A protein has these predicted regions:
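Structural/interface elements that position substrates and couple domains in central-metabolism enzymes
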Residues: 1-434
């Protein structure tokens, strides 16, 4: 097959590589000429994706995968076009369709009959049918269901382990017609293989959803569930702090019962998915008060963690605070919706002298965000762990000379290593005065 992948980002490029490794001819489209050049040189544009640096070079050198900035070089004659372009939310938490709209228009201008168009980017319910079907028809002059088919098939992978996740989870496909959905199912059955899983209600593989809207909602629901669950865990944690008990023991006890699946509380919920997709869900169901309350609770956690430090120390004004971890999660060089931004803002508002450390970022990269760089071993009054990098698990007071308080926002350090120095976690209960 000839496959075009629109969007050569942290999901799109591994997808393109996977298809090419399966023997298909793949052309990737991206608006960034630097990314395109690196891909064509066989160089991984964003390190950190398992196996990508190994898989990409032979595909680029053989021509099985190439990248371009020109839709005209990728779309005409493609059997399938896979859209993996970011959809973000604006400052008022509304979906910002501009990038996806532009990509869809550019793709549609070169669409040829017989093509399957699959949207893998997470979209609000109804967007595939109500927004992109008519837009493609308007620009291309073709008719969906006659000249081409559109399906929604959400990516369900995590950056850093895309290749493994493609086989791990069922591939959901929802079409705009029965025949169109069958077209989508046929494509994904041809390009994917799946792990055997005894825990699923039916065999792992491509799962038809009976319509694009069901597939759209499934992706939003699974991620919104996680945000709501974390929001509940964070509420439990705040109450545990107020009454002086350790919420981790409570959650461990609850989850020993098979119907309880409480997530872990923490200093922040970040990344491209969990903080964003509940907002996309709310775009279609604005009266979902449970969802909006959980989102608000999670968004407040960075400020809450700083407030606990301030309460224990009396004030943070003038104190040297080292914020450990800029990324939204450990081991991944990505700051999308990271808690670092909220924590820095709250610390500056409290009058603290803030510096940031992250093992994945050089000093100049941290400076580009407007942050002073902190280096382990430099004097500090307070340290706050924001990202669960492996390098922080074995931290001891000697790594942070003069530290009076550690706020372990991810509960990854050893309490025994901090005997004699105040250490608190989110939901860890009361702590001695510093």
């Amino acid at each position: 097959m000839r496959i075009a992948v629109v969007g050569m980002g942290k999901i799109g490029l591994p997808l393109a590589v996977h298809y090419a490794r399966g023997g298909h001819t793949v052309v990737g489209v991206d608006v960034n000429p630097g990314v395109v050049a690196l891909i064509n040189e066989g160089v991984e544009p964003f390190p950190g994706e398992a196996h990508l640096a190994e898989y990409l070079p032979p595909l680029a050198s053989s021509g099985a995968l190439r990248a371009t900035t020109e839709y005209a070089e990728a779309i005409p004659g493609a059997d399938t076009v896979v859209m993996v372009v970011p959809l973000v939310v604006d400052n008022e938490s509304r979906p910002d369709f501009r990038v996806m709209d532009a990509a869809t228009r550019s793709m549609a201008a070169h669409l040829t009959p017989g093509t399957l168009v699959s949207y893998e980017t997470t979209l609000p319910v109804g967007t595939t049918r109500g927004r992109y079907k008519p837009l493609i028809e308007e620009v291309s002059g073709l008719i969906e269901g006659c000249d081409f088919d559109v399906v929604f098939s959400p990516e369900r992978v995590l950056t850093g382990r895309v290749f493994a996740d493609l086989a791990r989870y069922p591939k959901l496909v929802g079409g705009l017609s029965e025949a169109g959905e069958a077209h989508g199912v046929s494509f994904y059955e041809a390009v994917l293989s799946f792990d055997e899983r005894d825990d699923l209600p039916r065999p792992n593989g491509v799962w038809p959803m009976g319509g694009a809207e069901a597939a759209e909602m499934a992706k939003l629901a699974e991620t919104t569930y996680r945000d709501v669950n974390i929001g509940l865990a964070n509420q439990f944690a705040r109450y545990a702090d107020a009454i002086g008990i350790n919420v981790a023991r409570v959650i461990e006890a609850c989850n020993s019962q098979p119907y309880s699946h409480i997530h872990r509380p923490g200093i922040a919920v970040g990344g491209h998915c969990i903080p964003v997709y509940p907002r996309l869900y709310l775009a279609g169901d604005p009266d979902a008060t449970i969802v909006s309350a959980a989102r608000a609770a999670n968004a407040d956690m960075p400020a809450y963690a700083v407030s606990r430090a301030s309460a224990l120390l009396g004030s943070l004004k003038g104190l040297r605070v080292a914020l450990l971890g800029a990324t939204y999660r450990g081991g991944v060089k990505e700051t999308a919706f990271s808690g670092v931004f909220g924590v820095v803002d709250a610390l500056r508002e409290a009058g603290a002298q803030v510096s940031v450390h992250d093992p994945l970022y050089a000093d100049d990269e941290l400076a580009a965000f407007g942050w002073d760089a902190y280096h382990l071993g430099e004097p500090v009054d307070v340290a706050i762990i924001q990202a669960d990098h492996a390098a922080y698990r074995n931290l001891v007071p000697a790594d942070l000379p003069g530290v009076r308080l550690l706020v372990d926002g991810r509960a990854i350090t050893s309490p025994e290593a901090w005997v004699g120095t105040s250490r608190i976690t989110v939901g860890g209960g009361s702590a001695p005065a510093c």
